[in-house]
């Protein structure tokens, strides 16, 4: 009788844990990553791209960086808290030689209460998690991009970028990659031709700009 009750209790705990996992944002995408990893785990010492949909949609990222082994773990319209939540699933296990982060865009879009300081503190949390579990890890942060559809958020994005840039300049083995100058017209407006019709996600010519900006910082 006791064993039967124990089995029932353990079954309930397992069910609750599974339900809670599925209730987490982007759980399906993370599950797919882990399923793929269980079939063929990526090689160690690769370069990991992680963050939001600007990386997720860069599905042919490996073709932009020939000679490098790239793992792409961009997912959904993720925010920095989402990347933090899943760091133990899609960052730490790979033991990459370098982590390239693009995130923060959706943090501002999610709520007007999110400030540049909010995003900065979230980034530092992610940075500290990576460095604590992968000591000395080479970390790159791609600037939050100037999407025309989110122009009202540009002032906060610029401030967050500056805070992150300043912070990374004081860290070892870390760099901030500024892509704003190449994505703006002479009058300061965003180059609409770089974007899909939603004026948020980029086309191939936008990613070509990112490739040129990122390539000099990639670890051989």
Regions found by a protein language model. Give the residues of each.
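Conserved Rossmann-like nucleotide-binding pocket used by diverse enzymes
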Residues: 17, 71, 140, 175
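Charged, glycine-enriched surface loops/patches
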Residues: 118-142, 159, 163-174
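Active-site flanking residues adjacent to catalytic metal/cofactor-binding acidic residues
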Residues: 50-51, 142, 177
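Bacterial Sec-dependent N-terminal signal peptides
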Residues: 1-25
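Catalytic His-Asp segment of secreted/periplasmic serine-dependent ester chemistry enzymes
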Residues: 146-220
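Alpha/beta-hydrolase-fold catalytic nucleophile elbow
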Residues: 102, 142-143
């Amino acid at each position: 009788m006791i064993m039967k009750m124990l089995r029932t209790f353990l079954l309930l705990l397992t069910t609750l844990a599974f339900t809670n996992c599925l209730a987490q944002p982007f759980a399906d995408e993370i599950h797919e990553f882990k399923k793929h990893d269980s079939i063929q785990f990526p090689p160690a010492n690769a370069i990991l791209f992680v963050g939001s949909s600007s990386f997720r949609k860069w599905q042919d990222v490996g073709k932009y960086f020939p000679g490098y082994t790239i793992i792409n773990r961009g997912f959904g319209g993720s925010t920095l808290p989402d990347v933090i939540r899943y760091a133990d699933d899609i960052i730490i296990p790979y033991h990459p030689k370098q982590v390239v982060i693009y995130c923060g865009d959706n943090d501002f879009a999610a709520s007007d209460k999110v400030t540049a300081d909010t995003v900065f503190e979230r980034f530092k949390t992610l940075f500290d998690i990576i460095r604590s579990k992968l000591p000395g890890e080479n970390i790159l942060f791609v600037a939050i991009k100037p999407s025309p559809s989110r122009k009202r958020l540009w002032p906060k994005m610029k401030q967050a970028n500056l805070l992150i840039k300043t912070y990374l300049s004081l860290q070892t083995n870390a760099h901030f990659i500024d892509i704003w100058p190449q994505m703006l017209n002479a009058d300061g407006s965003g180059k609409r031709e770089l974007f899909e019709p939603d004026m948020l996600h980029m086309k191939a010519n936008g990613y070509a700009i990112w490739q040129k900006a990122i390539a000099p910082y990639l670890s051989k």
